Amino acid sequence: MSFFIEKEVECNFNFDYEKVAEAVVSASLEHENFPYEAEVNLTLTDNEGIHAINKEYRQIDRPTDVLSFPMLSYETPGDFSFLSDENEDDFNPDTGEVMLGDIIISVDKVKEQAVEYGHSEKREFAFLITHSMLHLFGYDHMEADEAAVMEEHQRKILDALGITR
């Protein structure tokens, strides 16, 4: 697995955010039984940075906690059967890894929401990465049944890591 973190801002967390991020990405890949080596990019920004991206790509004029930019298109969430070694577009030509996509997190929102929801910054950070990884696997939460499936996957991944509220 290749996992890259780009810091656009200082990350003054009281935990090893790089270690937590990598553990969450690995646990998500394992939970979904992802059949290939994967490449994931994480950008850590602030409310101003994520606001600009949210406005540009989603036409939503406000900051958000996390944005996900999947590189793959799924017919069924979590079904990787469409991936094939013959389809070179899905693989990084230098590493041979499947390019899953990009995760962008507002460090400001991690801190704000941890206080708002009454849990640790570590839990909020891990939750947002888990949530975004599921989007990179094709899951969504536009409908109630989709949201329930996503919430169950999130809970199982975080429980496996011992990261709870």
Swiss-Prot record:
Enzyme Commission number, as recorded: 3.1.-.-
Gene3D superfamilies the UniProt entry points to: Metalloproteases ('zincins'), catalytic domain (3.40.390.30)
SUPFAM superfamilies associated with the record: Metalloproteases ('zincins'), catalytic domain
UniProt cofactor(s): Zn(2+)
Enzyme class, broadest EC rank: hydrolase
InterPro entries recorded: MetalPrtase_cat_dom_sf_prd, YbeY, YbeY_CS
Molecular function, one GO term: zinc ion binding
Keyword vocabulary terms for this entry: Cytoplasm, Endonuclease, Hydrolase, Metal-binding, Nuclease, Ribosome biogenesis, rRNA processing, Zinc
Any one annotated GO CC term: cytoplasm
Compartments, record wording: Cytoplasm
Details of cofactor binding: Binds 1 zinc ion.
Job of this protein: Single strand-specific metallo-endoribonuclease involved in late-stage 70S ribosome quality control and in maturation of the 3' terminus of the 16S rRNA.
Full protein name: Endoribonuclease YbeY
Organism annotation: Agathobacter rectalis (strain ATCC 33656 / DSM 3377 / JCM 17463 / KCTC 5835 / VPI 0990)
